[in-house]
Regions:
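N-terminal catalytic or cofactor-binding beta/alpha core of small enzyme domains
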Residues: 1-98, 109-118, 143, 147-179
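Small/polar glycine-rich anion-binding or flexible loop at a beta-alpha turn
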Residues: 97-101, 126-128
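Active-site glycine-rich loop that binds ribose-phosphate moieties when present
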Residues: 101, 105-107
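An accessory alpha-helical subdomain
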Residues: 121-136, 145-146
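Short intrinsically disordered coil segments
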Residues: 139-141
Length: 179
């Protein structure tokens, strides 16, 4: 859910009940034209837009006594180099924003740390997608606030769903190889 509290609760339940071997969280960043492998989550919620619960958080720590940041433990660099090498639209990003995506990324690591679990975990921002197989230069119905990791614009780039799905599947494959 696009909710600070809801995402923390859902993550806590899933990580406790399922006990996965790896965690790969995804979020849409409208306006990006590449799949972004996020490298760092910071202990900060700060966006002047509401989440789905109507909550606005500005300059608030996610966990007041928590770490300042967590780094992805997914094989980000190796996946990026390999996928970029075959011409896929990927990038390494050093900011997951300060909205719910960053919150999810941070909370996943914090919860895993509290559970004493050291497993691969990270976050990937995907651009808006369209169902056909040709990239679109613009979609005028999509906008996103900069705090959410996107851009505010009347037209934003999109990628074909199949391309995004392939990139995410490849990152999962690379993660499973290093486990």
């Amino acid at each position: 859910p696009v909710s600070y509290a809801g995402s923390s609760e859902a993550l806590g339940e899933m990580l406790t009940d399922i006990r996965p071997d790896a965690v790969l969280s995804l979020g849409v960043a409208v306006g990006r034209d590449k799949v972004s492998f996020e490298k760092v989550a910071i202990n900060l919620d700060s966006a002047d837009i509401e989440d789905n619960d109507g909550v606005v958080r500005v300059d608030e720590a996610i966990a007041p006594e928590g770490r300042e940041a967590y780094f992805s433990t997914l094989p980000v660099r190796a996946s990026y180099e390999r996928l970029r090498g075959v011409g896929l639209p990927v990038e390494i990003s050093y900011t997951a924003g300060t909205y719910v995506c960053n919150h999810v990324f941070y909370e996943a690591h914090r919860i895993l740390e509290r559970q004493g679990r050291r497993i691969p975990a990270g976050f990937v921002h995907i651009p808006a997608t369209q169902p056909d197989h040709e990239p679109s230069d613009a979609q005028t119905t999509l906008t996103a606030h900069a705090d959410a990791g996107g851009v505010e614009s009347e037209s934003v780039p999109t990628l074909p769903e199949a391309v995004v799905a392939r990139i995410v599947a490849e990152l999962v494959r690379d993660t499973l190889k290093v486990m």
